[in-house]
Curated annotation (Swiss-Prot):
One of its GO terms (cellular component) is plasma membrane. InterPro entries: TMEM205-like. The chain crosses the membrane at residues 7-29, 52-74, 87-105, 120-142. It comes from the Bacteria. Keywords: Cell membrane, Membrane, Transmembrane, Transmembrane helix. It is found in: Cell membrane. It holds the Pfam family DUF4149. The keyword Transmembrane applies. Its main location: membrane. The keyword Membrane applies. It is a multi-pass membrane protein. This is Uncharacterized protein aq_363.
Length: 143
């Protein structure tokens, strides 16, 4: 049983690292690099966004949900108020991710309004995702 706990916690941490790390990479490396390249910026964001959306949004968020539920029972022994809070924030992140990827991001190539929406939805999503990491640390420490 201890191996299962370690395995699912490990998977959860790796998936969270991929999700949050990907957003940090996009905002701290890709965005500043493309800022001075308006001729390729929008198309590059579209291409990078499509790839990250598939693995980051759809695959990793789904697997984070599954591993989070498994960890809730294997490690925490069930739901506690702090886990309810994390789950609530998680669902907000999923909603914002879908709004970003399926609405604003897709239209950002052709619309300045949607580009601005995509930018701010991405920033909000990053902030809330960092909050999820913080809540995860608190839960793991027993709060």
């Amino acid at each position: 049983m201890i191996f299962m706990k370690e395995l699912f916690l490990f998977l959860h941490v790796v998936l969270a690292t991929f999700w949050v790390g990907g957003m940090l990479f996009l905002s701290l490396v890709v965005a500043p690099y493309l800022k001075d390249k308006p001729q390729i910026r929008n198309e590059a964001f579209q291409e990078v966004g499509k790839r990250f959306s598939l693995y980051g949004t759809f695959l990793s968020l789904f697997l984070l949900f599954v591993t989070g539920l498994v960890n809730t029972y294997l490690i925490q022994g069930g739901f506690r108020p702090s886990i309810h809070t994390k789950l609530g924030v998680f669902f907000v992140v999923v909603f914002i991710s879908l709004l970003h990827d399926l609405w604003a991001g897709k239209k950002a190539l052709y619309s300045e309004k949607h580009r601005v929406w995509a930018k701010w939805l991405g920033i909000l999503n990053l902030i809330l995702s960092l909050l999820l990491v913080y809540l995860g640390v608190r839960i793991r420490l027993g709060y």
